Amino acid sequence: AGCHAEEIALHRNASEALETVIFGIELNAGDEVVLAKQDYPNMIGAWKQREKREGIKLVWVNVELPSEDENYLVKKYTDAFTPKTKVVQVTHMINWIGQKMPVRKIADAAKKKNIDVLVDGAHTFAHFEFLIPDLNCDYFGTSLHKWLGAPIGTGLLYVRKEKIKNTWPLFGAGDKDED
């Protein structure tokens, strides 16, 4: 994975890992989250729950797929960024059609605007050769049973070290460490 052990948390699957971030990071009413209509339904449902409960705003990217034009794909996301955008979720590979998204380019653009990047890597971890930190994302969730061949019920969450202290666990477990 290319990251430090303290940046990794084991989960039951990608959905649980990603929902730990979706429900565990602080967002305020009016803050915007950019995501795509092609994202996995569980993740969309989790974001919609936060929208309904807390008044965050979901900004939808609708890309025409498949596409071999990475610049087009990046532009669809970056055009959705505003000064209120706090998070962008990018699905590394859209499972419906196998479209691999240019995560690093989207993340680089987001970082220039101080936007956190959450990557759904359920269909790329151990399928393609890459290191999570090379994606320049803050959070990455995956299921280990797919391409890694680990037992069903194993998932992984990567949280960039400096983001750990501001990410609450999905399930409480006593006092939270400062880092």
Residues of each region from the PLM?
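Pyridoxal 5′-phosphate
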Residues: 1-179
